């Protein structure tokens, strides 16, 4: 599902031709990658 959001510019609804992008509140690819890296830290491990 997350891959659909990253690959499809309009989000998961591929048939909505009026939208041209994910919108102003969407997470950029860089923010998404950093968020995934931080979530991969095991519970109980020290974080930044």
From Swiss-Prot:
Superkingdom classification of source: Bacteria
Record's keyword terms, sorted: Toxin-antitoxin system
Disruption phenotype: Deletion of the phoAT-phoH2 genes has no visible growth phenotype.
Transmembrane annotation, as ranges: none
Disulfide bonds: none
Upregulating conditions: Part of the phoAT-phoH2 operon.
Family named by the database record: Belongs to the PhoAT antitoxin family.
Quaternary structure, from the entry: Interacts with toxin PhoH2.
Function: Probable antitoxin component of a type II toxin-antitoxin (TA) system. The probable cognate antitoxin is PhoAT; the toxin gene can be expressed in the absence of the antitoxin gene in M.smegmatis strain mc(2)155.
Protein name: Probable antitoxin PhoAT
Gene source species: Mycolicibacterium smegmatis (strain ATCC 700084 / mc(2)155) (Mycobacterium smegmatis)
